[in-house]
């Protein structure tokens, strides 16, 4: 529901714009600024926003066919922990959905769909939360250019 169900790769490119400031851009040109500093979401907050946004889209697309919400908020929370080896990660991730619809037949129909849609998003459709819950390897490669001489980093 939240994404087209084709198996095509997804990608974004990150560019540094200043110390601690970055822009992520997708192939279509959409972009978001983030980093460390006033007015910027941190990478951890972007992860929380991605989880909330993925499920929000699933719920919004379906309920909006019946009725336009008068309120639609999703709060994503998590506890950042420091493991014994010094590594950081989040645990206890949680989404809280706050929706309201008009008090008419269409609004009541949309309101009645929300719990089922949230469950379906969590269990089946939200690629972001399902990836986090199931875990996946994050690989990397490095290419460094020093004084104009390109080469692979050791």
Named regions from a protein language model:
Residues 1-49, 59-154:
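Extended beta-strand/beta-hairpin segments
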């Amino acid at each position: 529901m939240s994404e087209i169900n084709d198996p095509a790769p997804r990608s974004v490119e990150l560019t540094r714009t200043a110390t601690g400031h970055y822009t992520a851009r997708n192939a279509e040109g959409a972009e978001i600024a983030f980093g460390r500093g006033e007015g910027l979401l941190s990478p951890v907050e972007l992860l929380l926003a991605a989880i909330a946004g993925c499920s929000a889209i699933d719920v919004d697309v379906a309920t909006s066919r019946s009725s336009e919400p008068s309120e639609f908020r999703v709060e994503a929370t998590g506890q950042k922990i420091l493991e014994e080896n010094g590594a950081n990660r989040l645990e206890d991730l949680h989404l809280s959905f706050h929706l309201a619809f008009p008090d008419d037949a269409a609004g009541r129909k949309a309101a009645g769909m929300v719990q089922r849609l949230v469950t379906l998003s969590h269990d089946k459709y939200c690629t972001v939360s399902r990836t986090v819950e199931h875990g996946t390897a994050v690989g990397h490669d490095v290419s460094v250019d020093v004084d104009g001489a390109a080469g692979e980093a050791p």
